[in-house]
Every structure is written in structure tokens, then in C-alpha cells.
């Protein structure tokens, strides 16, 4: 008996849906808590930049812990694809940029779009960097602790 491809397995689809529900709720909560700034869609900008950073952290941390299988795959699907996919909202970014342009704020629309897209790349890169640094530090501590334990034998 052959198994369906990973993206068609009901358990994986349910992980993404469950994560997506919580990501949507988190986005809604932050959108409600963060005010717009003189008509500027600050909530979406903050959410997308935070999501890009956190996705970079998550994927780098998972990658450094091993192959994409078992618990790591479950976390990636539920948190990375589901939660972060629903939490970030580039369709809203596009809609808000068009709305800014339509309300005679063309410069603001361009700045918003560029800041969001370039900022997203920089935020995800910063997340990857932060997770990488954390991994190196914790690995060095573990290695040092093992060496100290062996020296005390």
C-alpha cells in the first residue's frame, strides 16, 4: 500500500489548519491592539515583520536540530506553515498599499510596500542569524559541560 504524498496526508493538513486558526486569532488580536498611524497600516507592518523574523528563527532552529521528520515536521507544519502563514498577511499588505495610493498617498504606498517587503527579508535574515547564534552558544555550553564532566571523572 502506498502512502499519499506528505501534502495530501490528512494529519498534515489538520496540523496546518490548527496552526492557521491560532495564527489568525493572534493576528486579529494584534490588529486590534496596534493603532494605525495617521492612516498608515502600522498593525500589518508590525505583524508581517514580526512573522518574518519568527519564521526565520523557527526554520533555522528546526534545520539545526536535524532532518524534517517526526516532531520537527509537525512543528514546521503547525507553527511555520499554519500559524505563521495565517499570522502574516501579504494580501492585506497589497490591499493596504493600493488603498494608500488611491487616497492620494502614492509616496506612502510605495514606502509602505518597500519597507514591508525589504523589511521582511531583513527580518527573516535576522531571525535566521539569531537562531544560528543561539544554537552555537548552546552547543558550546553543552560541549563545555561534557568536557568538564569527563575531566572530573
Placement of each model-derived feature along the sequence:
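Membrane-interface helix-loop junctions in multi-pass transporters/channels
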Residues: 1-153
